[in-house]
C-alpha cells in the first residue's frame, strides 16, 4: 500500500525528468504499480481510510511521484457530489490536441509531491484529446473537458518533468486571459 512517506517530494530530480515510455506486455511489477497507484487514490478519497493512514486526498498520481520514472499515471476524478466521473490508468499518454481556451481551478492547484501551498491560477486547456494505453495494452483515444481535463493535464505534466507551479504567471499569479473559464 502506498502511503504518504512513499510519495516523492518536490526537489527530488525524478520529478523533473521526462519519464520513459513503457513496453507491452507490462511486467507484473508495473501492473502492481498501476494497481497500487489507483488504490492510493481510492483510499485517499475515503475519509476513514485517509484519516487512519494520514493520506492526503488525491485525484491523480503519476509514477514519478512514487519514484518510478515511467509513463504511467492513475486518475480517479470525482464530481462535486463525490461521485467518480473518470477512473483510468494511463500508460504512455500523449495529448493529441487541446483547446485554445483555458480553464483553471478557482482555488488553484495542489500536488501530493508539493507540501507547501503555492498560490495562483494554473491555466490549462479546457478540452483535451488524449491517446493512451490501458494496463492491458489496449490503445484508447478520449476527449476530456473541464475538471477531468485539468487532472489529466496535471498528471501528464508530471510525466514530462513539469510541476503545476511552472504554469503560474510569476509576475502576476492571479492574472488570466480574458476568456479563461474559472471552475469553482
Curated annotation (Swiss-Prot):
Disulfide bonds: none annotated. It is an enzyme of class 3 (hydrolase). Fe cation binds at residues 111, 154, 158. Pfam families: Pep_deformylase. Its cofactor is Fe(2+). The active site is at residue 155. GO terms for biological process: co-translational protein modification; translation. It comes from the Bacteria. This is Peptide deformylase. It comes from Lactobacillus johnsonii (strain CNCM I-12250 / La1 / NCC 533).
